[in-house]
Design a protein with these regions (language model features):
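Residue-level detector of alpha-helical transmembrane segments in integral membrane proteins
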Residues: 2, 18-20
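Bacterial N-terminal signal peptides that target proteins for export
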Residues: 1-9
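Bacterial N-terminal signal peptides
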Residues: 8-18
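Beta-rich carbohydrate-recognition modules and glycan-binding surfaces
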Residues: 22-236
Length: 236
């Protein structure tokens, strides 16, 4: 190839680069039909870290064990009255918590907000601090506005130490829960309507073994992040 042709190609390339450099930058995408929707994470719907007595002793959990005045506590299972409150506030090695060791049958505990349902759709999530013994695990449970109870396939529980875990409710698969017997029924519930949830809590599907190592679940602080749906006068 001749030197004259090389020179011509170099000049052409330089002119092309100059033209592109003078062109204005493409405008940034504007919101509109093709724009991705804005995703908003829900606020704290409720937080509960329990309220211990001045004696700092072990005793059955009651409504007086709830520190959040907006919540009601609900106990389910034939021996749920044996769920104990124990631990000490601000003690990371033994925080104030509920303990299922004295439940001789499966037990469940749920929270009911006095003025609002929870909308557990979208990016709603649950966070809790738990510890277990043996093969015990805790699972989320919900009571829908129509009275249906569901239990999730999500399980938590570290036998080594207290562990804070958080999960998106949208990732959970659900079975119906017979709340009287605390047993699962039927097949996976496809696309349950979680837009209006009456109660939120947890269940240990195994009986407790009593004090000492063996089999039980501890649950300390519980946080739910969800939108609020006001209750009507008839549902408060």
């Amino acid at each position: 190839m001749s030197r004259r042709l090389y020179a011509s190609l170099a000049v052409a390339a330089a002119l092309t680069c100059s033209v592109y450099a003078q062109q204005p930058p493409a405008p940034a995408p504007q919101g509109g039909r093709g724009a991705a929707p804005c995703v908003t994470r829900p606020p704290v719907f409720f937080s509960e870290d329990w309220r211990q007595t001045p004696a700092n002793d072990e005793h059955p959990v009651t409504q007086q064990s709830i520190g959040n005045a907006s919540l009601e506590i609900k106990l389910y299972g034939s021996t749920a009255k044996e769920i104990q409150l124990t631990g000490t506030a601000n003690n990371e090695n033994n925080p104030t918590h509920v303990w299922t060791g004295l439940c001789s049958t499966p037990c469940a505990l749920a929270f009911r907000h006095k003025t609002n349902y929870a909308d557990l759709t979208g990016l709603a999530r649950i966070r809790w601090n738990t510890k277990t013994s043996g093969f015990h695990q805790i699972r989320p449970i919900v009571k829908l506005a129509d009275g249906t109870w569901l239990v999730g396939d999500r399980t938590d529980g570290s036998t080594r130490d207290w562990l804070v875990t958080e999960f998106n409710v949208a990732d959970v698969r659900w079975l119906k829960l017979d709340i009287e017997r605390i047993v699962t029924t039927g097949n996976i519930v496809e696309r349950p309507d979680l837009s209006k949830v009456d109660e939120i809590g947890f269940v240990d599907l195994m009986p407790g073994s009593g004090h000492g190592a063996g089999g039980w679940s501890d649950v300390a602080q519980v946080d739910v992040f969800a939108a609020s749906v006001p209750r009507t006068a008839s549902t408060k």
